[in-house]
Amino acid sequence: MAVSYDLRPIGTCPVRESDNIIVKERSKLSLIGLSQDEMAEALKAIGIPERQTRMRVRQLWHWLYVRGVSNFDEMLNISKPMQEIFKKHFSIARPEIAGEQISKDGTRKWLLRFPPRGAGRPVEIETVYIPEEGRGTLCLSSQVGCTLTCSFCYTGTQVLVRNLTAEEILAQLLVARDCLGDFPDRNTPDGAIVPVEGRKITNIVMMGMGEPLYNFEAVKKALLIASDGNGLSLSKRRITLSTSGVVPGMIRTGEEIGVMLAISLHAVNDTLRDMLVPINKKYPLALLMDACRQYPGLSNAKRITFEYVMLKDVNDSLDDAKRLVQLLKGIPAKINLIPFNPWPGSNYQCSDWEQIERFADVVNQAGYASPIRIPRGRDILAACGQLKSASERLRKSERLHLEHIVNS
């Protein structure tokens, strides 16, 4: 497979003029990411009569999340004078799209640049769209960088800069829907690989940069807005939050957000998991499995997904497969087997495909679904474990090294 680094101009993604007025909009309160109650309070604060606030919130919510507008002028059932008032006080601008890459398999990756907060600098994060037959999955980031330093993950080599806000998490979804033509009256880019019918984005996974449960409140707020039936209206059964095992946040996720849960597992004993996923030293497997068994709503209809990266001669033996079955005993679960995706400087190799299939057979025979995830977007560093905002600026030597390890 040849490696493509197509940092093409953003011609494939419709960016309206209003989306680029970022500096001017920075000092204004963004309505994106506010709850309806917070939006009502913001309207009262600028002098909107209290008797009007519920109606105005409904109007704004519809235009922002159903129609997907990013310019108050497009809100056709709001008077021009009221539009001007909103423009003066609020922002609904999108972040800057600093880069877009399109894989040969149709996977798309956007590099989004957010303005500085306080005395900080602008930050960049990556968001990935994975089209499949009948569905389209958007992988969202929750932090800029990560603190967890999982040894097989590229994001773990980028130090944590800061948490993303609810606005910035939601902005990833809004930008992706803009670019894919997933709002009413928008056109899908020519040649784009998307579901033939219905929505272009059917599923959300919090599996991008960062640990979602270390940014719980912002993630919660963003996902509750994304699943609101009067707006973006994504089913909670189609939203999956993935954690490396932040045990205290897991029960809260089920109780307060109610989405599907995925566990970044990758090992069946504490010694190995301490090395692969260092947070295991704080929340070892016994605590993690106990929290899984207590997850609210857990049932055969609401299973936990366990993610297991396949590392050659590290965690891929048939004995490991048998121990995995024992570890998950009694937990309604699905096990995603993930072929390791190489990145510059990684010290691991992907398990041989035949070994992955043998591993899957052991798990399947024990009654667990264990699909092997087909790598998507490897050629643009968009596959699982490959996200890192600095990857858009890889040095030539790193690109050549990546091409060598992908093709070997």
Curated annotation (Swiss-Prot):
Its main location: cytoplasm. It is found in: Cytoplasm. NCBIfam families: rRNA_mod_RlmN. It catalyses: adenosine(2503) in 23S rRNA + 2 reduced [2Fe-2S]-[ferredoxin] + 2 S-adenosyl-L-methionine = 2-methyladenosine(2503) in 23S rRNA + 5'-deoxyadenosine + L-methionine + 2 oxidized [2Fe-2S]-[ferredoxin] + S-adenosyl-L-homocysteine; adenosine(37) in tRNA + 2 reduced [2Fe-2S]-[ferredoxin] + 2 S-adenosyl-L-methionine = 2-methyladenosine(37) in tRNA + 5'-deoxyadenosine + L-methionine + 2 oxidized [2Fe-2S]-[ferredoxin] + S-adenosyl-L-homocysteine. This is Dual-specificity RNA methyltransferase RlmN. Binds 1 [4Fe-4S] cluster. The cluster is coordinated with 3 cysteines and an exchangeable S-adenosyl-L-methionine. Reaction proceeds by a ping-pong mechanism involving intermediate methylation of a conserved cysteine residue. Its cofactor is [4Fe-4S] cluster. Disulfide bonds join 139-384. GO terms for cellular component: cytoplasm. Residues 132-373 form the Radical SAM core domain. S-adenosyl-L-methionine binds at residues 210-211, 242, 264-266, 341. The lineage of its organism: Bacteria, Pseudomonadati, Pseudomonadota, Alphaproteobacteria, Hyphomicrobiales. The active site is at 126 (proton acceptor), 384 (s-methylcysteine intermediate). [4Fe-4S] cluster binds at residues 146, 150, 153.
